[in-house]
UniProtKB/Swiss-Prot annotation:
Could be part of a sulfur-relay system. This is Protein TusC homolog. Keywords: Cytoplasm. The keyword Cytoplasm applies. The keyword Transcription regulation does not apply.
Length: 119
């Protein structure tokens, strides 16, 4: 039986390579049929904001990678309600369908996965 993997992405999509690396790990795990979940926490919630154009920062747009997650079997996608609220992001305007979790649900989520990677 495969061990489940939760990837916590805490960095904004334009602050460096961590956001892309987190997505790459999730996609690779999904490609190998591992049970993978992804949690967008803190500034990682900005990855879910629609209409980003990071080309002027010489960064690649991560939206295509985000949209590919379900195609690779990564269906368990979560975001912190607190992270959304603190960053002024509205759940109904996110670029990807995710489950919004309160603090207690986040603690419960961490207990459900065998391995956790934070980037």
């Amino acid at each position: 039986m495969s061990q489940s993997l939760l990837i916590i992405s805490r960095q904004s999509p334009w602050s460096g390579p961590s956001a892309r690396e987190a997505l790459d790990i999730a996609l690779a795990g999904g490609a190998f049929d591992l049970p993978v979940g992804m949690l967008f926490l803190d500034d990682g919630a900005f990855q879910l904001a629609p209409g980003q154009h990071p080309a002027h920062l010489q960064q690649k747009d991560l939206q295509a990678n985000l949209q590919a997650l379900p195609m690779f079997g990564v269906d368990d996608l979560y975001v912190s309600a607190r992270s959304l609220r603190e960053r002024g992001l509205a759940e109904e305007r996110l670029a990807l369908a995710v489950e919004v979790l309160d603090d207690q649900a986040l603690r419960d989520l961490l207990q459900r996965y065998d391995q956790v990677i934070t980037l």
